[in-house]
Amino acid sequence: MPKSKINSPEENFDSSAAAGVDRRTPVKLNASGTPRWYIVIMLGLMLLGLAWLVVNYIAGPAIPLMVTLGPWNYLIGFGLFIVGLLMTMGWK
């Protein structure tokens, strides 16, 4: 049977790959990450928003500021929580 002139295994064999030589360029990783203060503020806002809603639900009528704000308490609580959640998109 005649040999194929295209794609013969002898011609495609790379001796450097068989020898274990790595020819890829190393990629430099950004080791900076997210600063600790960012994570603290992010988690703090989420917890503060949750605490605001819980306090409003449990002791809202007994706290004069909560009574004055009325339904705005929900906007404040959910707003703080959502800002914390939006900050998670910047967390690396």
UniProtKB/Swiss-Prot annotation:
The chain crosses the membrane at residues 39-59, 65-85. It is a multi-pass membrane protein. InterPro entries: CrgA (IPR009619). One of its GO terms (cellular component) is plasma membrane. It is found in: Cell membrane. NCBIfam families: PRK00159.1 (NF001194). HAMAP family: CrgA. Involved in cell division. This is Cell division protein CrgA. It comes from Corynebacterium urealyticum (strain ATCC 43042 / DSM 7109).
